[in-house]
Amino acid sequence: MRLERLILTENECCKTAKPMTPRGIMLHSTGADNPNLRRYVGPDDGLLGYNRFGNHWNTLRPGGRQVCVHAFIGRLADGGIASYQTLPWQQRGWHAGRGKKGSANATHIGIEICEDSLSDGLYFDSVYREAAELCAYLCIIFGLPAESVICHSEGYALGIASNHADVSHWFPRHGKSMGTFRADVARLISVGHIPPVFGAVVNVPSPIPQVWRVQLGAFSKRDNAAALLERVKNAGFSDAFLIRGS
């Protein structure tokens, strides 16, 4: 896990600064095909990259809306995956809306995963793992069980959130669900999740199944590697790629 911090101090929610004792975590996804953290977190800190539209959430009311979450998970400018804390954990966020029984804003830490096209398995695996590790870390420091982690659509069913589908529209596309997510968070808690150091990558002894990749060859000349890549793609492996090694 890589955890950075850029508090959205210009957001109205942050300025309001209402205290909150976390009793759970609510997982969201952004609902737009843009995996880049800079779309939501800003200004550029040297890692995020420049948002030329300036439409990040570090403004009073992003897009005219009263919205803010405690963390975003997505892609850095260099292509790496990271989590960004954007509100103090024990401050009320504006992420859940309201249901028949109230609002999870008063009880739950809100985490947004930046969506892509929803079809990239490698991106999904990376942000899924990052989210599980962040949730396990938060469960440990606040003494929460893995069962306290829900998504927005589950919050709606419980009557504590507005009617949204996230993340139930995305996870099943990759063989996952909130049930498997909570199980992975529970396993991370059981092995003793390592608290993160801001600005550093933390290697977690994770029991979450790894993704296994196949290398077909290594060549001293790029042309030879490219020729093999073309043969592999012609055979139907359209997601094959070249990577320069040493």
PLM segments and residue spans:
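Solvent-exposed beta-strand motifs enriched in subsets of small alpha/beta binding domains
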Residues: G199-S246
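Basic/polar, cationic surfaces and motifs that engage anionic cell-wall
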Residues: M1-I7, K15-T21, G102-I109, C114-S206, ...
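Short strand-loop junctions, especially beta-strand C-caps/beta-turns
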Residues: T30, C114-D116, Q215-F219
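N-terminal catalytic cores of peptidoglycan-degrading enzymes
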Residues: M1-A104, H174, A218
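A general secondary-structure signal for short beta-strands and their flanking turns/coil
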Residues: Q66, A106, P209-V211
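Short secondary-structure junction motifs
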Residues: C68, L144-A146, F237
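Sec/Tat-exported extracytoplasmic proteins
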Residues: S29-G31, L138-F142, I189, V232-G236
